[in-house]
Amino acid sequence: NRDPRRVEVGRRRRSMGTQRALGRRRPRSPETLDVDLIALVDRLARRLRNAHRVCRTVTLRLRFDDLSRATRSHTLPEATADTVTLLHAGRALLAIAMPDIATRGITLIGITFGNLFADDAVQLALPFDGASSEAIDTTLDRVHERFGSSAVTRGVLLGRHQGLQVPLLPDR
């Protein structure tokens, strides 16, 4: 079969995501799922910043024990690549899904950042509360680039295997 449509080059991705298969070995506690979510968001937010992108939509993907799937999404008021903001959105979505997870079990958790924009095309907001984690994110990104992804990590992720990392195409 041939697709008659022309190939579009130079078009940027509209979303990026990552997921983790959990298997059916044992039930997952909410705390364990939270740690899995932290690892996914941390890795994906770093990838988002490395691509010089920001996102407005966070989508949580789930696969249950019966192999059915569900997604939950939230659109942020402004585009961001801030790890803490994205993690809060992901945690809120996971909290909404917890009753389904408790009754149906879970075999996969994934997170997708959508509605992407170039980071220089977004109007910056003034941080009136003085609390911005942009400096922390930038510093951690530089440490990871220079010394590897396991040089510095969140305390909750210490001693945990984060799964295999697959090579990725550039996020242009």
Predicted features and spans:
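Acidic, metal-coordinating catalytic segment for phosphate/diphosphate chemistry
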Residues: 78-172
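DNA-contacting surface of Y-family translesion DNA polymerases
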Residues: 1-103
